[in-house]
């Protein structure tokens, strides 16, 4: 097994070479971009722990995300990306990788990158239909990890397969893969079908589901058992349909966690969401990922989402409606209404409502 320290040194060495090679040229070789998201949330106090029967409400405002990215084309076949993330008073490296595209059937990516799992998780936060991703995407779709991956396109099939060493708080190693197929496409209209898997080793590290009900500043009411996990096995299926102004996407995911005592906990969930461009235009699509609106204007959105913790006997559902207004390529406004229901064995159904607003500025 490749050690995480070795992979870290390799990635940092590669980035140093990238920096030297790039700055030896001219500054125009570096593409600097970024964005900032300012959020306001107002929600029932029932979405806070210990306030299940309260009729009060809470309101919060925050910088939800701020990102700064540096991209560089080093040569014909080599390029790099380095992205910093700023949120919750902390700074972290989001992306730090090199990509080689000189082979005919596959591209090679080395460094900190997104694992290939989950249509919604792979969609940039700037291009989401709703302010927040669904519960299942946040709970189980892997995010960014240090690793090495191969990806490519063969006819109408896009694929990615990688070996990763995530943060030790999540897993010690993982093999993750995704295949997406477009069986039908006419101009910008298309049907996308995808499957993905991830086999993750925990080696006794703690695993726990701990998620809010799609309201970022509310409490994490979905709290599963604390498990000293040996491994996690997860699978997902995905669908995306783009038809003129209309967008529909859906996913279903299952996960099984095996403890070091050889007991298992099962989880599953999914979502169905839509978007409709009132002002014309359509949603873009590239590399098996959903893109931004093609034109400025209004978009209405909606989502039904659920998450089930089987052994813990907990269920959560959300119903959301939203409206987005894209002013231009730099400025976007978003507003969502969320109704959330939560049930735990031995208790009653807890419900809450929320309004979430966002101002997004990109450069």
Regions found by a protein language model. Name each.
Residues 26-27, 47-48, 53-55, 206-363:
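Outer-membrane beta-barrel pore domains
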Residues 1-27:
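Cleavable N-terminal export/targeting peptides
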Residues 25-45, 49-203, 271, 276-293, ...:
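Outer membrane beta-barrel
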């Amino acid at each position: 097994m490749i050690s995480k320290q070795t992979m870290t040194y390799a990635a940092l060495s590669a980035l140093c070479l990238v920096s030297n090679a790039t700055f030896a040229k001219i500054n125009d070789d570096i593409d600097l971009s970024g964005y900032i998201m300012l959020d306001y949330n107002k929600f029932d106090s029932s979405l806070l722990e210990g306030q299940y029967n309260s009729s009060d409400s809470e309101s919060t405002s925050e910088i939800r995300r701020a990102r700064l990215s540096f991209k560089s084309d080093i040569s014909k076949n080599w390029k790099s990306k380095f992205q910093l993330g700023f949120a919750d008073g902390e700074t972290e490296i989001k992306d730090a990788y090199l990509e080689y595209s000189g082979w005919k059937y596959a591209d090679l990516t080395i460094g900190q990158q997104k694992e290939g799992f989950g249509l919604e998780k792979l969609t940039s936060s700037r291009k989401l239909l709703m302010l927040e991703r669904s519960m299942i995407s946040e709970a189980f779709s892997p995010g960014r990890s240090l690793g090495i991956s191969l990806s490519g396109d063969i006819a109408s099939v896009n694929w990615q397969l990688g070996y990763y060493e995530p943060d030790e708080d999540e897993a010690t190693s993982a093999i993750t893969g995704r295949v997406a197929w477009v069986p039908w496409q006419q101009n910008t209209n298309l049907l996308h079908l995808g499957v993905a898997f991830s086999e993750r080793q925990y080696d006794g590290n703690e695993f726990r589901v701990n998620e809010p009900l799609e309201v970022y500043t509310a409490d994490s009411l979905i709290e599963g058992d604390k498990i000293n996990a040996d491994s996690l096995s997860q699978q997902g299926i995905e669908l995306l349909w783009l038809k003129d102004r209309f967008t529909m996407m859906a996913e279903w995911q299952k996960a099984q966690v095996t403890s070091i005592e050889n007991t298992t906990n099962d989880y599953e969930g999914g979502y169905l969401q839509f978007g409709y461009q009132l002002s014309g235009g359509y949603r873009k699509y590239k590399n098996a990922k959903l893109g931004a609106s093609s034109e400025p204007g209004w978009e209405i959105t909606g989502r039904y989402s659920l998450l089930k913790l089987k052994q813990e006997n907990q269920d959560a559902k959300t119903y959301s409606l939203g409206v987005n207004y894209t002013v231009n390529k730099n400025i976007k406004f978003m507003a969502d209404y969320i109704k959330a229901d939560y049930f735990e064995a031995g208790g009653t159904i807890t419900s809450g409502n929320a309004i979430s607003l966002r101002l997004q500025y990109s450069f």
